[in-house]
Every structure is written in structure tokens, then in C-alpha cells.
């Protein structure tokens, strides 16, 4: 290696051959000599008050306030409509999980493990929103990962350790905070092994990924590369203990109801998938899910065994979709109403129009996710025109606006008001 190719300390300029250890950071290096020098300076300098507060928030046993299950559910209710059974189950699981962490921080003996959660349910039923809301009310770092992008080590794709890296980034590289965070892994059903995956080729995105995830979910000290592992193989690793990280995984698990029905000796109802009766029957079956059903679906026993809380999110009803439009603290209709109020224009939705929007979302088969797209398409042209038109006083959205694509009703200001 030539002199110009040697990495050097960004502070003192010593090359890697002149020091015992050279630690790499994002685009910088620091040697062991400079670390010792900085450490000596810090030992002689009183820490600022803000640093003392931060330290106390991560290490003090009393700093972790555990909300009761009722308090947790009440907060979730402010943002998540429906899913009463799921919200109660998760509230209890999260309460027990953080109560366990607090006990461990106080050096108490704990005889129960952590409460990882597996959420079943169709797209747009609120699985991700529940996880996001939990992280918000508990004030802990949170990250979302997509299971379909994960692969085993050695294959093209994302290493499972990168999930922990994203949580560490969400915690601003505060390891103690990250170790109490929440990781939500979506589309977990997509990594179920299938009978088609015979031994001719390696099951890159199925059983192998479950095995890789198993280690960090059950709890291990993971070596996390701060820049990601594959493009920067020589960087210094950060050690993160995943034992107290809460893992929530979710997936639609399409046709799992048929596996459950077979176990129960039932036949699935012979109606169209869109009928309310078929949906009710499917939700009823998923509520009876057992570990053996998930194994038959393609999840490995060791993986499923790490989730002692398995709960079903039911498909949202028409009334619940209407509530989602108007009731939560961050309801989408409230958001658009505020946008138009900033232009001094009143936005009015007739009740029939709200139900028409909900029906359209239901037909799209993406649950609550379709609501935002429908409203955006409906109001985009108005949001373009209104800022340039001071004559508009109000806009009324009627049922025909949704069902027959008729223009919204524009109510003009009186001439006196314009003047």
C-alpha cells in the first residue's frame, strides 16, 4: 500500500501504520491517541446540564414511565379507528414489555420474556398505524422495515442488521435509547417458505430470512455497521443488544383463513370475496388462528415461537372508514379543511359524500390507504385554482361529486364581502 492510499487521522494526521487503532466514522477517522487526549480533556471538564439530563433519560431506572394498558389504548384510540380487540391485546403486551424493561433496569429478577407482536390483517386495516402510534405515545425510537427487501447474508438485498441500524439512526445513534425502541416489519407473510421452494435453489427470501431475523428478534448483541455492511466492510461496528427491542411484525396472510377452516373441519363460505358475509367469516376464522396454522402457511416454528402475542386486525367496515375520514386527531378531512381555511374558504362534506368516498375506498381493496388518494384526486384542481380566486366563500362536496364525477358546488362570496 502506498503512502497516499493510507487512511490518516482527521485530527492529528497520523497514518494508520503509525497508530495502534484508527476508527472510521462517516467520512472521518480518529486514532487511539486523539481519543485518549479527548478523554483526558473531558475528564477535567464538567458536563453541561443538558448532557446530565440526557444521561438520566437513558440510564435511570425511574426514567421509564410505564403507561397502563388503559392509558395506552386511550392514546391509540385517538388515531386508530376500530380494531378494539387488537388494540386491547397490544396495549397489554406493550405494558408488560416495558414493565419488564423497567424491572431489569432496577436489577430485579424477571421471569417472563418480552412480548413481541404478530399482527394479521388485510392491507389498510391499521397495522402499521398502530405500531407508529405506540412509538409516538411511548416516546421511543421507531423504524419500519419491509420484509420483502431482506435477504440472507451473501445475497443481493438488505441484511437484517440494517433494520437495527435504522432504529439506531432514529435514536440519533444513542445506543441505550435504541435498545428500548420499536421495530415494525411489514409484509412478514411474504417470507413464508412454500412447497414450491425445493432444494434445487436456495430460498433466498423465505426460510433463510426468517432464520436471520430469528436471532435479532429473540435477543442478541448485534454488531451494527454505521454505514451499512456491504459497501463499507472495514468500518468499526457498533454493538446493540436487541434483547429489549420490541418487534412488531405484520402481514395480510392471504388464504390463511382457508388453512384455519381446514383445521377446524369447516368449509369457507361460497360467496364472492367482496360480500360482507365473506368478510365476517374470514375475520371470524382469523381470530381463531393457532401457531400450527402459521406453520402450515410457511412460517418456521422457531420464528413464530418468538411471538407470544398474535392478533388479527379485521377488515374495516364502511362506518369505520367514514370515522377514519373525520374522527381521529389527524383525520384527513380535518387536514384538507384546514388547508382551505388558510385560503379563507370553507370546505363542506355532505354525509352521503363521505359514505360514497368510503365505499370507493372499500372497492379499491386497500382499506384506509385509499382514502387519501381519493381525496387528493378529488381536491387537487380546487387546491390549484382557489389561491388565485378571492371570490370563493365555500365548497360543498356532494354524493354526486363522488359517484357521478360531478363538479363540487362552488359558493361565491357576496359582492360586499369581495369589496
Curated annotation (Swiss-Prot):
Transmembrane segments: none
Domain of life: Bacteria
InterPro entries registered for this protein in UniProt: AAA+_ATPase (IPR003593), ATP-dep_Clp_protease_ClpX (IPR050052), ATPase_AAA_core (IPR003959), Clp_ATPase_C (IPR019489), Clp_protease_ATP-bd_su_ClpX (IPR004487), ClpX_bact (IPR046425), P-loop_NTPase (IPR027417), Znf_CppX_C4 (IPR010603)
UniProt entry keywords in alphabetical sequence: ATP-binding, Chaperone, Metal-binding, Nucleotide-binding, Zinc
GO terms for biological process, alphabetical: cell division; proteolysis involved in protein catabolic process
Complex and partners: Component of the ClpX-ClpP complex. Forms a hexameric ring that, in the presence of ATP, binds to fourteen ClpP subunits assembled into a disk-like structure with a central cavity, resembling the structure of eukaryotic proteasomes.
Name of the featured protein: ATP-dependent Clp protease ATP-binding subunit ClpX
Organism: Chlamydia trachomatis serovar A (strain ATCC VR-571B / DSM 19440 / HAR-13)
